[in-house]
Amino acid sequence: MVEKIWFDNHPLKYLLWPLLWPLSLLFGAISKSKRQQYQSGKKQAYKAPVPVVVVGNITAGGNGKTPVVVWLVEQLQQLGYKPGVVSRGYGAKAPQYPLVLDDNTPAKHCGDEPKLIYRRTAAPVAVDPVRANAVKALLETSVDIIITDDGLQHYALERDIEFVIVDGNRRFGNESLIPLGPLREGVERLSEVDFIITNGGQAQYGEMPMSLTPSKAINLKTKQQVEVSELRDLVAFAGIGHPPRFFNTLNAMNADVKVTKGFADHQDFDRQELQALAQQGANVIMTEKDAVKCDSYAQDNWWYLPVSAQFESNDAERILNRIKEVKATYGSPSA
Protein backbone atom coordinates (compact mmCIF):
# COMPACT_ATOMS: atom_id res chain seq x y z
CA MET A 1 0.00 0.00 0.00
CA VAL A 2 2.88 2.38 0.79
CA GLU A 3 4.27 2.06 -2.73
CA LYS A 4 0.82 2.75 -4.20
CA ILE A 5 0.78 6.02 -2.27
CA TRP A 6 4.32 6.84 -3.35
CA PHE A 7 4.15 5.88 -7.02
CA ASP A 8 0.52 5.34 -8.08
CA ASN A 9 -1.24 8.43 -6.69
CA HIS A 10 -3.49 6.26 -4.53
CA PRO A 11 -6.47 8.19 -3.04
CA LEU A 12 -5.47 7.03 0.44
CA LYS A 13 -2.62 9.53 0.35
CA TYR A 14 -5.10 12.36 0.94
CA LEU A 15 -6.30 10.71 4.14
CA LEU A 16 -2.77 10.03 5.38
CA TRP A 17 -1.27 13.33 4.26
CA PRO A 18 -1.92 15.19 7.58
CA LEU A 19 -0.03 12.44 9.41
CA LEU A 20 2.76 11.74 6.93
CA TRP A 21 3.61 15.28 5.83
CA PRO A 22 4.92 16.43 9.26
CA LEU A 23 6.93 13.21 9.52
CA SER A 24 8.44 13.88 6.10
CA LEU A 25 9.43 17.38 7.21
CA LEU A 26 11.06 15.89 10.30
CA PHE A 27 12.87 13.26 8.24
CA GLY A 28 14.17 15.93 5.88
CA ALA A 29 15.34 18.17 8.71
CA ILE A 30 17.21 15.34 10.43
CA SER A 31 18.82 14.17 7.18
CA LYS A 32 19.89 17.69 6.25
CA SER A 33 21.31 18.31 9.72
CA LYS A 34 23.36 15.10 9.63
CA ARG A 35 24.87 15.98 6.28
CA GLN A 36 25.63 19.55 7.31
CA GLN A 37 27.50 18.31 10.37
CA TYR A 38 29.95 16.51 8.10
CA GLN A 39 30.11 19.31 5.55
CA SER A 40 30.88 21.88 8.26
CA GLY A 41 33.49 19.71 9.94
CA LYS A 42 31.55 19.32 13.20
CA LYS A 43 31.75 15.60 12.53
CA GLN A 44 34.79 14.05 10.90
CA ALA A 45 34.23 11.78 7.92
CA TYR A 46 36.70 8.98 7.22
CA LYS A 47 38.98 9.64 4.26
CA ALA A 48 40.34 6.46 2.71
CA PRO A 49 43.83 6.36 1.17
CA VAL A 50 42.29 5.02 -2.06
CA PRO A 51 39.45 6.35 -4.22
CA VAL A 52 35.91 5.67 -3.00
CA VAL A 53 33.06 5.32 -5.50
CA VAL A 54 29.50 5.34 -4.15
CA VAL A 55 26.68 3.67 -6.07
CA GLY A 56 23.40 4.66 -4.45
CA ASN A 57 20.03 6.25 -4.97
CA ILE A 58 17.80 8.95 -3.54
CA THR A 59 14.73 6.73 -3.31
CA ALA A 60 13.89 3.84 -1.02
CA GLY A 61 13.98 0.38 -2.54
CA GLY A 62 15.97 -1.24 -5.31
CA ASN A 63 16.66 0.55 -8.57
CA GLY A 64 19.40 -1.66 -9.99
CA LYS A 65 22.41 -0.60 -7.92
CA THR A 66 23.95 -4.04 -7.55
CA PRO A 67 24.27 -4.78 -11.30
CA VAL A 68 26.03 -1.42 -11.68
CA VAL A 69 28.42 -2.33 -8.87
CA VAL A 70 29.16 -5.66 -10.56
CA TRP A 71 29.72 -3.90 -13.89
CA LEU A 72 32.12 -1.40 -12.31
CA VAL A 73 34.08 -4.13 -10.55
CA GLU A 74 34.40 -6.20 -13.72
CA GLN A 75 35.45 -3.21 -15.82
CA LEU A 76 38.05 -2.11 -13.29
CA GLN A 77 39.43 -5.63 -13.01
CA GLN A 78 39.86 -5.72 -16.78
CA LEU A 79 41.82 -2.46 -16.53
CA GLY A 80 44.20 -4.03 -14.01
CA TYR A 81 42.84 -2.37 -10.88
CA LYS A 82 42.09 -4.21 -7.64
CA PRO A 83 38.62 -3.05 -6.61
CA GLY A 84 36.95 -4.01 -3.37
CA VAL A 85 33.31 -3.59 -2.38
CA VAL A 86 31.84 -2.47 0.93
CA SER A 87 28.25 -2.75 2.06
CA ARG A 88 26.18 -2.26 5.16
CA GLY A 89 24.97 -5.84 4.83
CA TYR A 90 21.35 -4.86 5.08
CA GLY A 91 19.04 -7.55 6.44
CA ALA A 92 21.89 -9.72 7.72
CA LYS A 93 23.59 -10.27 11.06
CA ALA A 94 27.26 -11.18 11.10
CA PRO A 95 28.96 -12.95 14.03
CA GLN A 96 31.34 -9.99 14.14
CA TYR A 97 32.13 -6.82 12.19
CA PRO A 98 33.76 -6.02 9.92
CA LEU A 99 33.10 -9.23 8.02
CA VAL A 100 35.23 -9.99 4.97
CA LEU A 101 33.47 -12.54 2.80
CA ASP A 102 34.90 -15.89 1.78
CA ASP A 103 33.46 -18.82 -0.15
CA ASN A 104 31.75 -20.18 2.95
CA THR A 105 30.09 -16.98 4.18
CA PRO A 106 26.30 -17.51 4.25
CA ALA A 107 24.00 -14.80 2.97
CA LYS A 108 22.36 -14.57 6.41
CA HIS A 109 25.68 -13.24 7.76
CA CYS A 110 26.60 -10.83 4.97
CA GLY A 111 23.40 -10.01 3.08
CA ASP A 112 22.16 -11.13 -0.31
CA GLU A 113 23.69 -8.35 -2.39
CA PRO A 114 27.25 -8.63 -0.96
CA LYS A 115 27.09 -12.40 -1.47
CA LEU A 116 25.97 -11.95 -5.07
CA ILE A 117 28.74 -9.44 -5.78
CA TYR A 118 31.37 -11.71 -4.26
CA ARG A 119 30.21 -14.70 -6.30
CA ARG A 120 30.00 -12.80 -9.57
CA THR A 121 33.28 -10.93 -9.34
CA ALA A 122 35.54 -12.76 -6.83
CA ALA A 123 36.53 -9.28 -5.63
CA PRO A 124 37.14 -8.65 -1.92
CA VAL A 125 33.86 -7.73 -0.22
CA ALA A 126 33.41 -6.50 3.35
CA VAL A 127 30.27 -5.63 5.30
CA ASP A 128 29.89 -3.43 8.34
CA PRO A 129 27.14 -1.01 9.44
CA VAL A 130 30.02 1.46 9.83
CA ARG A 131 31.29 1.50 6.27
CA ALA A 132 34.61 3.08 7.24
CA ASN A 133 35.43 -0.06 9.21
CA ALA A 134 34.61 -2.19 6.18
CA VAL A 135 36.94 -0.03 4.08
CA LYS A 136 39.76 -0.44 6.60
CA ALA A 137 39.31 -4.20 6.52
CA LEU A 138 39.54 -4.23 2.72
CA LEU A 139 42.69 -2.12 2.73
CA GLU A 140 44.42 -5.09 4.34
CA THR A 141 43.65 -7.09 1.18
CA SER A 142 45.60 -4.60 -0.99
CA VAL A 143 42.64 -3.14 -2.86
CA ASP A 144 43.38 0.08 -4.72
CA ILE A 145 39.83 1.37 -5.18
CA ILE A 146 36.66 1.01 -3.11
CA ILE A 147 33.12 0.72 -4.44
CA THR A 148 30.32 1.06 -1.93
CA ASP A 149 27.05 -0.70 -2.71
CA ASP A 150 24.48 1.85 -1.56
CA GLY A 151 25.54 4.41 1.04
CA LEU A 152 24.91 7.67 -0.81
CA GLN A 153 23.50 9.07 2.43
CA HIS A 154 26.29 7.57 4.58
CA TYR A 155 28.25 10.82 4.87
CA ALA A 156 30.58 9.44 7.53
CA LEU A 157 32.58 8.07 4.59
CA GLU A 158 34.18 10.54 2.19
CA ARG A 159 33.75 9.74 -1.46
CA ASP A 160 35.34 10.80 -4.74
CA ILE A 161 32.66 9.80 -7.23
CA GLU A 162 28.91 9.43 -6.75
CA PHE A 163 26.49 7.46 -8.89
CA VAL A 164 22.72 7.67 -8.46
CA ILE A 165 20.62 4.92 -10.00
CA VAL A 166 17.10 5.93 -11.06
CA ASP A 167 14.20 3.65 -11.92
CA GLY A 168 13.38 5.01 -15.36
CA ASN A 169 9.76 3.95 -15.17
CA ARG A 170 8.80 4.93 -11.63
CA ARG A 171 11.26 7.83 -11.37
CA PHE A 172 10.75 9.63 -8.03
CA GLY A 173 7.08 8.91 -7.47
CA ASN A 174 5.30 11.81 -5.80
CA GLU A 175 8.70 13.46 -5.14
CA SER A 176 8.08 13.66 -1.39
CA LEU A 177 10.45 12.60 1.35
CA ILE A 178 9.96 9.44 3.42
CA PRO A 179 7.36 8.51 4.69
CA LEU A 180 5.00 10.60 2.54
CA GLY A 181 7.04 9.68 -0.53
CA PRO A 182 9.96 7.48 -1.55
CA LEU A 183 12.74 10.07 -1.37
CA ARG A 184 15.70 9.70 0.97
CA GLU A 185 16.89 13.12 -0.21
CA GLY A 186 15.31 15.81 -2.36
CA VAL A 187 15.68 15.64 -6.14
CA GLU A 188 17.95 18.69 -5.95
CA ARG A 189 20.63 16.30 -4.67
CA LEU A 190 20.97 15.00 -8.23
CA SER A 191 22.70 18.22 -9.29
CA GLU A 192 25.64 17.34 -7.02
CA VAL A 193 26.41 13.79 -8.15
CA ASP A 194 28.80 12.74 -10.90
CA PHE A 195 26.58 10.31 -12.80
CA ILE A 196 22.83 9.72 -12.94
CA ILE A 197 22.12 6.26 -14.34
CA THR A 198 18.59 5.55 -15.56
CA ASN A 199 17.55 1.92 -15.39
CA GLY A 200 14.95 1.37 -18.11
CA GLY A 201 12.35 3.87 -19.23
CA GLN A 202 13.42 7.08 -20.91
CA ALA A 203 16.58 8.79 -19.71
CA GLN A 204 16.16 12.52 -19.14
CA TYR A 205 18.65 15.25 -20.05
CA GLY A 206 21.92 14.70 -18.21
CA GLU A 207 21.18 11.06 -17.44
CA MET A 208 22.86 7.93 -18.79
CA PRO A 209 20.58 5.14 -20.01
CA MET A 210 21.29 1.68 -18.65
CA SER A 211 19.55 -1.60 -19.33
CA LEU A 212 19.62 -4.87 -17.44
CA THR A 213 20.23 -7.66 -19.91
CA PRO A 214 19.28 -11.18 -18.82
CA SER A 215 21.29 -14.21 -19.84
CA LYS A 216 20.40 -17.89 -19.75
CA ALA A 217 18.73 -19.41 -16.72
CA ILE A 218 21.17 -21.25 -14.44
CA ASN A 219 20.26 -24.28 -12.37
CA LEU A 220 20.99 -23.72 -8.68
CA LYS A 221 22.24 -27.28 -8.15
CA THR A 222 23.88 -28.37 -11.40
CA LYS A 223 24.80 -24.94 -12.86
CA GLN A 224 23.34 -26.09 -16.18
CA GLN A 225 22.36 -23.17 -18.43
CA VAL A 226 19.26 -23.11 -20.62
CA GLU A 227 17.18 -20.53 -22.41
CA VAL A 228 14.34 -19.32 -20.21
CA SER A 229 11.86 -19.99 -23.01
CA GLU A 230 12.76 -23.71 -22.82
CA LEU A 231 11.54 -24.01 -19.22
CA ARG A 232 7.90 -24.98 -18.97
CA ASP A 233 5.26 -24.30 -16.33
CA LEU A 234 7.30 -21.80 -14.30
CA VAL A 235 6.72 -20.59 -10.78
CA ALA A 236 8.49 -17.22 -10.54
CA PHE A 237 9.29 -15.42 -7.30
CA ALA A 238 11.36 -12.38 -6.39
CA GLY A 239 12.40 -10.79 -3.12
CA ILE A 240 13.71 -7.51 -4.52
CA GLY A 241 12.82 -3.85 -4.28
CA HIS A 242 10.24 -4.04 -7.09
CA PRO A 243 9.30 -7.66 -7.94
CA PRO A 244 7.14 -6.74 -10.99
CA ARG A 245 10.34 -5.69 -12.77
CA PHE A 246 11.53 -9.31 -12.66
CA PHE A 247 8.20 -10.69 -13.80
CA ASN A 248 8.10 -8.19 -16.68
CA THR A 249 11.56 -9.33 -17.74
CA LEU A 250 10.36 -12.93 -17.84
CA ASN A 251 7.32 -11.96 -19.91
CA ALA A 252 9.55 -10.12 -22.37
CA MET A 253 11.57 -13.34 -22.76
CA ASN A 254 8.43 -15.33 -23.59
CA ALA A 255 8.79 -17.37 -20.42
CA ASP A 256 6.04 -19.86 -19.64
CA VAL A 257 5.15 -18.34 -16.26
CA LYS A 258 2.15 -19.82 -14.48
CA VAL A 259 2.52 -18.39 -10.98
CA THR A 260 4.24 -15.26 -9.61
CA LYS A 261 5.00 -14.39 -6.02
CA GLY A 262 6.60 -11.20 -4.74
CA PHE A 263 8.43 -10.98 -1.42
CA ALA A 264 9.84 -8.04 0.49
CA ASP A 265 13.35 -6.90 -0.38
CA HIS A 266 16.03 -8.73 1.66
CA GLN A 267 13.41 -11.08 3.08
CA ASP A 268 14.71 -14.14 4.90
CA PHE A 269 12.91 -16.91 3.06
CA ASP A 270 11.03 -19.68 4.82
CA ARG A 271 12.20 -22.98 3.38
CA GLN A 272 8.84 -24.70 3.76
CA GLU A 273 7.01 -21.79 2.13
CA LEU A 274 9.26 -21.86 -0.93
CA GLN A 275 9.01 -25.62 -1.25
CA ALA A 276 5.22 -25.40 -1.09
CA LEU A 277 5.28 -22.62 -3.69
CA ALA A 278 7.44 -24.80 -5.94
CA GLN A 279 4.74 -27.47 -6.00
CA GLN A 280 2.56 -25.18 -8.11
CA GLY A 281 4.64 -25.67 -11.26
CA ALA A 282 7.19 -27.85 -13.03
CA ASN A 283 10.09 -25.42 -12.60
CA VAL A 284 10.97 -22.55 -10.29
CA ILE A 285 12.78 -19.40 -11.39
CA MET A 286 14.07 -16.57 -9.22
CA THR A 287 16.48 -13.65 -9.30
CA GLU A 288 20.19 -14.18 -8.73
CA LYS A 289 19.89 -12.18 -5.52
CA ASP A 290 17.31 -14.63 -4.22
CA ALA A 291 19.36 -17.64 -5.29
CA VAL A 292 22.21 -16.87 -2.90
CA LYS A 293 19.78 -17.19 0.01
CA CYS A 294 18.22 -20.53 -0.83
CA ASP A 295 20.80 -22.50 -2.81
CA SER A 296 21.52 -24.74 0.20
CA TYR A 297 18.10 -26.37 -0.07
CA ALA A 298 17.38 -25.87 -3.77
CA GLN A 299 15.71 -28.64 -5.74
CA ASP A 300 16.76 -30.00 -9.12
CA ASN A 301 14.17 -27.86 -10.92
CA TRP A 302 15.14 -24.51 -9.36
CA TRP A 303 16.71 -21.89 -11.64
CA TYR A 304 17.84 -18.29 -11.40
CA LEU A 305 18.15 -15.58 -14.01
CA PRO A 306 21.33 -13.47 -13.96
CA VAL A 307 21.18 -9.95 -15.34
CA SER A 308 24.02 -7.66 -16.34
CA ALA A 309 24.17 -3.89 -16.69
CA GLN A 310 24.66 -2.59 -20.22
CA PHE A 311 25.74 0.94 -21.12
CA GLU A 312 26.20 2.74 -24.39
CA SER A 313 29.88 2.61 -25.32
CA ASN A 314 30.48 6.36 -25.04
CA ASP A 315 28.84 6.46 -21.60
CA ALA A 316 30.92 3.52 -20.40
CA GLU A 317 34.03 5.32 -21.62
CA ARG A 318 33.05 8.51 -19.77
CA ILE A 319 32.55 6.58 -16.54
CA LEU A 320 35.86 4.75 -16.73
CA ASN A 321 37.79 7.86 -17.77
CA ARG A 322 36.43 9.71 -14.74
CA ILE A 323 37.53 6.91 -12.44
CA LYS A 324 40.97 6.85 -14.08
CA GLU A 325 41.30 10.61 -13.52
CA VAL A 326 40.49 10.28 -9.83
CA LYS A 327 42.71 7.22 -9.43
CA ALA A 328 45.64 9.13 -10.90
CA THR A 329 45.46 11.64 -8.04
CA TYR A 330 46.14 8.90 -5.47
CA GLY A 331 49.37 7.14 -4.70
CA SER A 332 49.53 3.43 -3.99
CA PRO A 333 47.77 2.25 -0.81
CA SER A 334 51.14 1.52 0.77
CA ALA A 335 52.61 4.91 -0.08
Swiss-Prot record:
GO terms for molecular function: ATP binding; tetraacyldisaccharide 4'-kinase activity. The keyword Nucleotide-binding applies. The keyword Lipid metabolism applies. ATP binds at residues 59-66. One of its GO terms (biological process) is lipid A biosynthetic process. Signal peptide: none annotated. The lineage of its organism: Bacteria, Pseudomonadati, Pseudomonadota, Gammaproteobacteria, Vibrionales. It catalyses: a lipid A disaccharide + ATP = a lipid IVA + ADP + H(+). One of its GO terms (cellular component) is plasma membrane. It is an enzyme of class 2 (transferase). HAMAP family: LpxK. Disulfide bonds: none annotated. It comes from the Bacteria. Its EC number is 2.7.1.130. This is Tetraacyldisaccharide 4'-kinase. InterPro entries: LpxK, P-loop_NTPase. Belongs to the LpxK family. Pathway: Glycolipid biosynthesis; lipid IV(A) biosynthesis; lipid IV(A) from (3R)-3-hydroxytetradecanoyl-[acyl-carrier-protein] and UDP-N-acetyl-alpha-D-glucosamine: step 6/6. Transfers the gamma-phosphate of ATP to the 4'-position of a tetraacyldisaccharide 1-phosphate intermediate (termed DS-1-P) to form tetraacyldisaccharide 1,4'-bis-phosphate (lipid IVA). Keywords: ATP-binding, Kinase, Lipid A biosynthesis, Lipid biosynthesis, Lipid metabolism, Nucleotide-binding, Transferase. SUPFAM superfamilies: P-loop containing nucleoside triphosphate hydrolases (SSF52540).
